[in-house]
Amino acid sequence: TGFIYEGKQEFEVISNRVDSLPALPMKIMMNVGNPDRAFDFARLPNEGVGLARLEFIINRMIGIHPKALLEFNQQDAALQEEINEMIAGYESPVEFYIARLVEGIASIGSAFYPKKVIVRMSDFKSNEYANLVGGDRYEPEEENPMLGFRGASRYISESFRDCFALECEAIKRVRNDMGLKNVEVMIPFVRTVKEAEQVVGLLAEQGLERGKDGLRVIMMCEVPSNALLADQFLEHFDGFSIGSNDLTQLTLGLDRDSGIISHLFDERDQAVKILLSMAIKAAKAKGAYIGICGQGPSDHADFAGWLVEQGIDTVSLNPDTVIDTWLYLAEAHG
């Protein structure tokens, strides 16, 4: 449903020349999830992709739980029939999953080549994985999936390692077979330094060794422990990309999806800023990459300005906010 307005509505047209935008003290990157729009978004002024979400590709282009494909022969006849209809034309269920991931990642990687494209490995929560075809057979029922079986904990678990291996295979094909070495890896929701060590080791086992062929492995800085122990986490990664959404929720102890307390959600809260400053300073001291890909800078230009003052390397924005935020930062900090 929509709205019907009586009479001719007034509107304003704002034109900007994107080929002559003023210089900035940091780089503007973009958050891109939809491979179908990648070449459109690449026409905007940018320094690459600070966040490419695998979840969008899995949801939009695959729609099937990876375990249901790995264990296709063990599924009941009804599920096999449903899956067969979805994977028609592919060599095998597993090849369907990998090939579709490759298609999505390569679309974004090639659209922005040779600029960096940081691909975040899947960050579905258990309830989101359960919504995929066959997913309800494999996912636990959790009271609070936000704090549950996700991120690095999921990758290194015995029950999901073979699923994570499919994502790694897709990244390898994009980088090695297609030559898109601009595609880099990002790991979300790393709770402890031990997990950091384990997940980087697992990547190496899967053929994605940090530093080999120029591969950078970035970590999402989105758990308070990441900022508090930034020096230790950075021993295992080439830098941080701050996820301000989860970091804010976990710092303030709130669920931003709760209508009762959602008004308290603000990335500009002083407690959040203290953690952000700690992470930025630690990365700068080590000469490591430090960027942000959370929603905050897209929603609040003044927050983006504050991040610039802290010395952040890159701010990754939603495509529809790139021009306005660029102009704001140029005026305030150019």
Give residue spans per PLM region:
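Beta-strand/loop-dominated core regions that host nucleotide or nucleotide-derived cofactor-binding catalytic loops
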Residues: 8-9
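Conserved alpha/beta-domain cores
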Residues: 15-334
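Conformationally flexible catalytic loops at phosphate/diphosphate-handling active centers
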Residues: 1-2
